[in-house]
Amino acid sequence: MAELNKSWILRQRPVGDLKEGDLELVEGPLEPLKDGEVRTRLIYLSLDPTNRIWMSDVDGYLPPVGIGDAMRGGGLAEVVESKFDGLKPGDIVNTGLATWSLYSNLPGEALNALPRLPGVPLTAYMGPLGATGMTAYFGLMDIAKPKAGETVVVSAAAGAVGSMVGQIAKIQGCRVVGIAGSDEKCKWLTETAGFDAAINYKSENVGAALDEHCPDGIDINFENVGGKIMDQVIARLNDFSRMPLCGLISTYNATEPVPGPYSFSNLLMRRTLLKGFIVIDYFPRFPEGIQQMAQWLMAGKIKFETDIVHGLENAPGSLSRLFEGKNLGKLMVQVSEPPEA
């Protein structure tokens, strides 16, 4: 019997939180492989806040996923068949913008076989050596340009991006304060990731805690969340501060217009540099970022956690973990067994 593909199809635009019926898991035959293509088997599927944006009919940095189309997403996959000279079966690739599918036919020229570094697990290519690591690296180093002695605040600090941002800032000699949603996460940030302080926004007064941990004000705010927490940080920014705007996860499931930051005028008074960015803007520079992150990772200067859910069928139900703050580190779905190193 011929092997079947499995794909999550977008059936309707979600309103608010993702619910049953918005996506449907379907089976179907494998598409014929064309010259120049490779067939990949998905190993790890990345779950990211941007997945929710792509489901909505909004004017984003990419067109929304069409109704009836396979859900867009990326991950790590193994080449199982190749009609492209540069890749062979057994190679591991980062799929880029593929789909939530067990098998995909992808253009070989857009892919590169990942090097296997000694002592580095494959999951590192979903974290510090993947898109989340590149988001942290370029957002901080290229936009914020941290200097030793500066104070850096990171929201969603125990997430895949935030945890990398804080550790890179520490390597640069900064004081780093993270904001997260549980005592467990705050403990990990200070005891494992090396943050100077961590604030549990669910149990602490964020403004008072920022005053305590940032007595000299805030030089860099790496923003992942938005909303009321962002307001508290903006109100404490220093002159000529920098604010890479990476995400606004608190707003992605909103069903009504979201009010703007009440402390917005402080960006003017403090002459803050505020810049939104998308990691794909930096794609041509990924080799530079991966090389540096790999050096830090292999030197033990970067720690990372993975939150792994098993089974492609569990992908939609697991996406909510991001918006509920339940994940520690990089959230992903293991779709199939990874090959032995």
Briefly describe each language-model feature range.
Residues M71-E78, P89-A156:
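NAD(P)H dinucleotide-binding glycine-rich loop of Rossmann-like/cofactor-binding domains
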Residues N205-P215:
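Short amphipathic alpha-helix with an adjacent loop that forms part of the alpha/beta core around
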Residues S101-L102, G181-W188, V206, V258-F264:
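Short, glycine/polar-rich helix-capping loops at beta-to-alpha or helix-loop-helix junctions
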Residues N94, V153, I199, N221-F222:
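N-terminal Rossmann-like NAD(P) cofactor-binding module of classical short-chain dehydrogenase/reductase
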Residues K228-I302, V335-A341:
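Glycine-rich phosphate-binding loop and adjacent beta-alpha segment
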Residues P29-L47, M55-T99:
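Glycine-rich beta-strand-centered segment in the early N-terminal region that forms part
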Residues M126-E204:
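Mid-domain Rossmann-like dinucleotide-binding core that forms the NAD(H)/NADP(H) cofactor-binding site
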Residues A2-N5, K301-I308, P316-A341:
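C-terminal capping/lid region of NAD(P)-dependent oxidoreductase domains
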